[in-house]
Amino acid sequence: MAAAAEEGMSAAALVMSVPDSIGRSPESEGVGAGDEEKDAATKGTVAVGDSEEDGEDVFEVERILDMKCEGGKNLYKVRWKGYTSEDDTWEPEVHLEDCKEVLLEFRKKLAENKAKAVRKDIQRLSLNNDIFEADSDSDQQSDTKEDISPRKKKKKIKCKEETSPEDLRKKRTKMGKLKDKFKTELESTSEIIGFDVKTKKRIWEVKEELKDSKKPKKDEIKETKELKKANKRAEVRDLKIKIREDVKENRKTKKERYIESPLESESPNDSLILEDDSEDFISDNREENQNVRSVRDKTAQETVQEGIFEKHLDDLISIEEDAGTRVRRKKTKPRKFEEPKEIKKLESTNAFLERRAIPKKQRNQDKGISNLELNKLPSPVFAQTLKSSRLSGEEKSLKSPDLAEEEKEKKNEPKGKYQKRYDLDKEEKARKEPKVLKSFKEIRNAFDLFKKTTEEKNDVLENNSKREEISLDSKIMNDNKTKDKCSLKEKRNTRDETDTWAYIAAEGDQEVSDSVCQTDETSDGRQPVLSLGMDLQLEWMKLEDFQKHLDGEDEPFITTNRIPNNLLRDAVKNGDYIAVKVALNSNEEYNLDQEDSTGMTLVMLAAAGGQDDLLRLLITKGAKVNGRQKNGTTALIHAAEKNFLTTVAILLEAGAFVNVQQSNGETALMKACKRGNSDIVRLVIECGADCNILSKHQNSALYFAKQCNNVLVYELLKSHLETLSRVAEETIRDYFESRLALLEPVFPIACHRLCEGPDFSTDFNYMPPQNMPEGSGVLLFIFHANFLGKDVIARLCGPCSVQAVVLNDKFQLPVFLDSHFVYSFSPVAGPNKLFIRLTEAPFAKVKLLIGAYRVQLQ
């Protein structure tokens, strides 16, 4: 058999052995060569091509794509069978010694036409070679790897010697119980064995013919393909008929042999693809003796199981016909049971391992379940699952019968062996964890849920839920898992959030006062090192800490190094909050109002840079916000000019003056109008900014708003001025009860914040009318007003802060002796200078609206 298999090696599928240490081969799950060879020598037969047990991974070369010369050596680009172009590797010629035919074919093609791409000449083996490939592949690969691993070859030869005719007879007698749970007649098994030998001889003849024509022409290749297909169909048809005849004969002789041979059957696919080793036979015989009693109790169930088997067999054979050219391999493990595995493609191999892992867990759960419950479900489920599996890959359709075969063996085994096998499986799974694609996981879960009882489903759901906690990208497998997954995700999110804040709270004890800064403390207790990172990261602090930070009440830093004034100034200029914090919390005294050559203070530097944290810190430490440069610029003007809205808000809250003018007469409101920032404009005018102040060039804020073509800012200012005029006139009419008629204003209404100082002054031009009507004159009104957003409330009664009014160096007299809101006013034609002395009230919120009107008594 070994010689025939060797001669039948096809030029269409060559096996190449690649050591783990060379280059980049397609991914494998192999382990060290030395350890695996030692394991193979001591534990029994090891099938060639098993990527888990062999020291080397065995891959099939599909074709050679390209060749290049590098470092004086020829490298060949190899396409591996079952892999995509992404897994192509460059291999030296020495690695292709076992694939000389492929190499010669490539060289021949290269000589014929170098410009053309290498055509795919290597064809896969037909199903003729697949039926008993578990036998032939072992011999074929043993000869291929003769020089590399002699010990493995000896093991394989020993395995073949052990498979004696007596063993085959035992195995075939078990196959008879495939459908009816009883041992078949010796004649039936002999016929099956004889049929198998004839079938193998026919396959060997086909292989010999294929070997004689290893390099056929295109026409010969087509004829060979047609011949293979015809032989394949004929063999499958004959095999199906033969098995059905054996089933009928077994059914007739079942009752006669019942008392003499009550033995347990094995998997339904033994006659097709599975061969057991000697250890398997011993354990199975024990198993059969122990189950004699249970077999007698199950006679009533056999007719149902026979029908299930026939249906299952039809499905399997129909899948065999559609399978195409696929390679089936046998895998033996150093344990008392056999688990078949096909090595053809790495992804499909991993998927099969994962699908095998679930039945291993299930074995331990099946202890309390009757054989009737287990045997009624698998067969139809297998057929349905196998068909759906073929849609995602060709390999799956052949793996599923193996899986069915393996599970039927395990279900019929005594309960005493479940725990031992579960322990062995658990140990091996701990050593080798397969990588599985998500699509295979979905198929596996759907596959298993059909076979499990309600109690088992609950156990599997718990295990799957644990996996879903680890993998956030897992998909919902079925409706039963959805609720568990949602609840677990909610718990996990709540736990993560709680842990995050708990970690922050715990870390707060290690931080050096300010939650914005983190300190890195070494494990050996060395001096804490300041982490000069980004400030104001809210993930680092709780809400209470952030509020303390805003209020400047966070704990001080402790430092022993003195920071000089020039470095403090540079830190403010560069926005280094930590350095400023350390300096201001030290014992060193700093002049926070220090000025440079232009009069720029630290507050101005922070405002001009938009450093809100530094600005709050400096204000908290007592820095003045209304300092002026030599050109009259203030911190508020800097912030408005640089368009920093939050900085403007901080300064206004700290009491910054809004009507301060630069040397060119411009105010913060004018700067905001130039920038076109309506938010800053609204914020400033609601705080009492004077919209009618004129610059050095006699331009008002309204002029700058119009100049920047910002309609929103212009309308905002115009609306505010109209509101002030309307409120002033209404207040006058209400106060004088229509005894006084307003003719025209003498100058636009001015606004002065009492907190900005006790003195108010303004210049205006007055042009008296040519004809002054009798009973008319000019009065000065000083309203006390409050701004409530866009609303303005004014009064001419109550407490008054006006002490004196001076016009052109002449005191003006109040109209009412007990009230200083209304003064007689005598301007001259031309320029006039008005000065008003007020009560000093630096914290007053009241605004003064100052306006003069020409009035007529009625």
Curated annotation (Swiss-Prot):
UniProt region (Disordered), positions on chain: 18-55, 129-175, 209-234, 250-300, 321-431
InterPro entries, per database record: Ankyrin_rpt (IPR002110), Ankyrin_rpt-contain_sf (IPR036770), Chromo-like_dom_sf (IPR016197), Chromo/chromo_shadow_dom (IPR000953), Chromo_domain (IPR023780), Chromodomain_CS (IPR023779), Dendritic_Spine_Reg/Scaffold (IPR050889)
Subcellular location: Nucleus; Chromosome
A Gene Ontology cellular-component term: nucleolus
PROSITE patterns for this protein: ANK_REP_REGION, ANK_REPEAT, CHROMO_1, CHROMO_2
Superkingdom, taxonomy of origin: Eukaryota
Organs and tissues of expression: Expressed in the spermatogonia, spermatocytes and granular cells within the cerebellum.
Phosphothreonine: modified positions: 144, 385, 453
Residues found modified as Phosphoserine: 51, 85, 136, 138, 149, 164, 188, 267, 271, 278, 318, 392, 400
Location of region: Histone H3K9me3 binding: 80-87
Domain Chromo: 59-118
Regions of compositional bias (Acidic residues) in chain numbering: 273-282
Classification via Pfam families: Ank (PF00023), Ank_2 (PF12796), Chromo (PF00385)
Extent of the ANK repeats: 598-627, 631-660, 664-693, 697-726
Molecular function terms from GO: chromatin binding; histone H3K9me2/3 reader activity
Compositional bias ranges of the Basic and acidic residues kind: 159-169, 283-300, 335-357, 407-431
Any one Gene Ontology BP term: negative regulation of gene expression via chromosomal CpG island methylation
Domain notes: The chromo domain mediates interaction with methylated 'Lys-9' of histone H3 (H3K9me), with the highest affinity for the trimethylated form (H3K9me3).
Subunit structure: Homodimer. Interacts (via chromo domain) with histone H3K9me3. Has the highest affinity for H3K9me3, and lesser affinity for H3K9me2 and H3K9me1. Component of the HUSH complex; at least composed of TASOR, PPHLN1 and MPHOSPH8. Interacts with DNMT3, EHMT1 and SETDB1. Interacts with MORC2; the interaction associateS MORC2 with the HUSH complex which recruits MORC2 to heterochromatic loci. Interacts with ZNF638; leading to recruitment of the HUSH complex to unintegrated retroviral DNA. Interacts with TASOR.
Annotated function: Heterochromatin component that specifically recognizes and binds methylated 'Lys-9' of histone H3 (H3K9me) and promotes recruitment of proteins that mediate epigenetic repression. Mediates recruitment of the HUSH complex to H3K9me3 sites: the HUSH complex is recruited to genomic loci rich in H3K9me3 and is required to maintain transcriptional silencing by promoting recruitment of SETDB1, a histone methyltransferase that mediates further deposition of H3K9me3, as well as MORC2.
Descriptive protein name: M-phase phosphoprotein 8
Organism: Mus musculus (Mouse)
